[in-house]
């Protein structure tokens, strides 16, 4: 049984779950490469407003969608790239755009899969700050292998080794956890850090 905001979501279609307040990004960037930054965001907004292919509904929602897309563009720091095709953005900018599309519908729970995979250290640092800003007031659940990213983003961390949760706590407590140290650093390092020989 999976509960979101007091309602069961298991068995629901992805678009229904999205409209209930959960959105996600993929490990592989999932945007429209031949649309501009603004158009990608507007598509996300229109979809969240229930627009599919009804022309009259599209017209009635266009002003609101344009305004929301503009706000999102500023939030993800791509307002200077408004008319740039997504395919011409840097990889980090494409990931930022995907985050914008992910939150376009106002989701209060955001799932991210390896959000910084493939980024340079400086891009990763900037992206961590961006994620923190745009997910403020939302629940963020991320799967991430870069422990620097995990410790930079998380209030709580679950460490999973071979399918078993070996720790679930604050970053400081997880960092000090002997089982976590052994799993990620090896027992000799964990013993040395604990004062062993």
Label each region the model flagged.
Residues 1-197:
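Glycine-rich phosphate-binding loops of nucleotide-dependent enzymes
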